[in-house]
Amino acid sequence: MSPQTETKASVGFKAGVKDYKLTYHTPDYETKDTDILAAFRVTPQPGVPPEEAGAAVAAESSTGTWTTVWTDGLTSLDRYKGRCYHIEPVAGEESQFIAYVAYPLDLFEEGSVTNMFTSIVGNVFGFKALRALRLEDLRIPPAYSKTFQGPPHGIQVERDKLNKYGRPLLGCTIKPKLGLSAKNYGRAVYECLRGGLDFTKDDENVNSQPFMRWRDRFLFCAEAIYKAQAETGEIKGHYLNATAGTCEEMMKRAIFARELGVPIVMHDYLTGGFTANTSLAHYCRDNGLLLHIHRAMHAVIDRQKNHGIHFRVLAKALRMSGGDHIHAGTVVGKLEGEREITLGFVDLLRDDYIEKDRSRGIYFTQDWVSLPGVLPVASGGIHVWHMPALTEIFGDDSVLQFGGGTLGHPWGNAPGAVANRVALEACVQARNEGRDLAREGNEIIREAAKWSPELAAACEVWKEIKFEFPAMDTL
């Protein structure tokens, strides 16, 4: 009789409850190249040994339940169970441990981030034996990542489509995010694109409200794009947010965007859901649309240090589900992001092969094989004085997005865009000439401002603006 069909009739079924660690804590297990590996930060309840807590996580996120069941004998648990194969204390934290769990690949549906998360984090986070639980990292084996399409196009294809090389891309979120009419919204888009930006953007909560229905916004933004392209000779885009209450409505909006001939659409992937996002990503590849991803709601999931899911996991999931851009923090602006940790998941978004590096929060070596990369988007409370630091931190393969830092310019939207474009070009030129952006950044901006009155005005407005709060996301 095969292992999968062998029963326990010969030994008799013994009902009852036994410790998880007897079955799911396997410190001698050697991980396989095809296993999905997870690193959980576990905070057990008082009196619960870390081995039992780690084993409980492995059990409840794979084949286990609270009691022995008769149907265990109808399959091979050794083949399908998750295994807690290593536990280590968290330095500097009391009663916190990193539990490493290996999952056999057969537990997961191919090409489904939804199923992967339903298994690994779907139920275990409410387990009473744990005070708190955080998924810090996942190792996605090539055998699984190859079942995903991934980003619709990727970094190089996007550059080729836009004919823009050798520098970060520049964007702007239109403000106020809610309340503008479609025509005034389109006017703001045109002014920003005419001034030198590559992209403008719908804010995450701009969908189809009474003051501005989606079809009207799409039409006026398309008009703005074509007018700005004709005047500047550059390819322009606006992230048209296709997020909607149903997948059918979302696809209808994406189809209309394609019919208008615009280059890019947008989706809120966490509030919209991974199933909807993957469907949209497939449509975008098939129809030549770039896909910008907003991470609205991420901080509800990832901001607490001891409970939830770290953003590096959500970033990996997005690369699998599909997106050409994703917001990734700024390090220097108003939103969360500690430098080394942020650069860790930026590399996980962009690079093909990323070595394990615990100093940057990377618990596993990740090999994406040929899955296209994702451009990280720096957005939130940034302005021209941040440009040298952003250029140095994020490099060329990034999108730098200035909302208030464009639209808050004292002379208007187009001069605000000019100021940002001049600051960026000055920083890129200085870097290419061998200057140190970290040390000489302010001087570089001041030099450029001498021949750009728009930049000089922006420098004066934002010279005192800083967001100096400690990052919550630390190792």
Swiss-Prot record:
Residues the record marks as active site: K175 (proton acceptor), H294 (proton acceptor)
Bilayer-crossing regions: none
Residues the UniProt record annotates as site (Transition state stabilizer): K334
GO cellular component: chloroplast
PTM statement from Swiss-Prot or TrEMBL: The disulfide bond which can form in the large chain dimeric partners within the hexadecamer appears to be associated with oxidative stress and protein turnover.
Gene Ontology terms, MF aspect: magnesium ion binding; monooxygenase activity; ribulose-bisphosphate carboxylase activity
Annotated keywords: Acetylation, Calvin cycle, Carbon dioxide fixation, Chloroplast, Disulfide bond, Lyase, Magnesium, Metal-binding, Methylation, Monooxygenase, Oxidoreductase, Photorespiration, Photosynthesis, Plastid
Annotated binding of Mg(2+), by residue: K201, D203, E204
A Pfam short name: RuBisCO_large_N
The protein's assembly and partners: Heterohexadecamer of 8 large chains and 8 small chains; disulfide-linked. The disulfide link is formed within the large subunit homodimers.
Official protein name in the record: Ribulose bisphosphate carboxylase large chain
Species annotation: Betula papyrifera
